[in-house]
């Protein structure tokens, strides 16, 4: 748990500057870009104390017209920006969070707004920020504050039960000229709770050099184009393989970090660098030619797993018993065959396939690839065939793809029970 909490995190940030920002900078896009690069450099500095690096991986400037309606109503603007990000931006460019920078003044004293504990979520990992000051640092601290909300942090309130021992930290409820670059204990606790509760996966992945669109800065701990390594400032760098002042490897070093870097040299070929997580995963070993561990590889689809209870499918071992337990708890088991006969009817929620409004009943041989049936506890003479469904998600409560439906057979994407050797 402590190792999970202490791991370095990387927020891959996309920033969108709207039309009002272009007007504010008199159409000088180079000047506007510089302004934004400075903002991101400051945000990265602020977050390094939490072992988080913030990298700008995408910058979009709406120089002709805004792609959403940016208004003084912050709540509405945030909602439309979140929707646009999910339906448009994410399809074009991979990133962890997107923030809008605008010169439109929001209602009241609001200078920014973001969804709380939303990092890595498709529709809510967003924030909006008003470019409210001539002082770059103050705008940067506003965006750092809104990003803090995405990472699960609430405002620092100074009251008796929640003494945050900081009136001017990043998550202070209102911005002031006294604001500091520090996080309060409350913010640190909020962030750790967010990591524990939500387990956001996307921020564990380090951006590659070529993903970062801002000019390289030696000493910001991010490995960028033109750098061989970056271990922070010469004062703080602890890495003997890297020359902090130049971001070049020290004499005789092959590497400065990586799962396959051992004392500044590439690990020997064959050294295991990532253990197999389970029987549908494969262990990876170093090549001897690189500091990086090869890409995480999975067992082939159809390989038997969990003592032949199932077959591997995309790195998982889907079996009906585990699906029942996930729906109904630990005393659930798979229902007897008689329950699965409901899937032969093709009525209501009992079927193998549904295309638009047309329902296709299961053939006898495919009945265990339709709706999943479970029972709770020991069954007497009367069997209660438990099943579940959702109006929003047609696959919810169905037997998972790749699940073993008979010996040597699995459910394919058409929900047919087919030979495991020809299914994939």
Swiss-Prot record:
The modification Pyrrolidone carboxylic acid is found at residue 1. The active site is at 146. Keywords: Disulfide bond, Fibrinogenolytic toxin, Glycoprotein, Hemostasis impairing toxin, Hydrolase, Metal-binding, Pyrrolidone carboxylic acid, Secreted, Toxin, Zinc. Pfam families: ADAM_CR (PF08516), Disintegrin (PF00200), Reprolysin (PF01421). SMART domains: ACR (SM00608), DISIN (SM00050). Its EC number is 3.4.24.-. The lineage of its organism: Eukaryota, Metazoa, Chordata, Craniata, Vertebrata. Optimum pH is 9.5. The keyword Translocase does not apply. Ca(2+) 3 binds at residues 281, 284, 296. Residues 9-207 form the Peptidase M12B domain. Its proteolytic activity is inhibited by EDTA, TPEN, 1,10-phenanthroline, and some thiol compounds, but is enhanced by alkaline earth metal ions (Mg2+, Ca2+, Sr2+, and Ba2+). Its activity is not modulated by urea (4 M). Its cofactor is Zn(2+). It is an enzyme of class 3 (hydrolase). This is Zinc metalloproteinase-disintegrin-like brevilysin H2a. Glycosylated. Zn(2+) binds at residues 145, 149, 155. It is found in: Secreted. GO terms for cellular component: extracellular region; plasma membrane. Disulfide bonds join 120-202, 164-186, 166-169, 218-247, 229-242, 231-237, 241-264, 255-261, 260-286, 273-293, 280-312, 305-317, 324-374, 339-385, 352-362, 369-411, 405-417. Binds 1 zinc ion per subunit. Glycans are attached at residues 69, 185, 331. A motif (D/ECD-tripeptide) lies at residues 279-281. Monomer. It comes from the Eukaryota. Belongs to the venom metalloproteinase (M12B) family. P-III subfamily. P-IIIa sub-subfamily. One of its GO terms (molecular function) is metal ion binding.
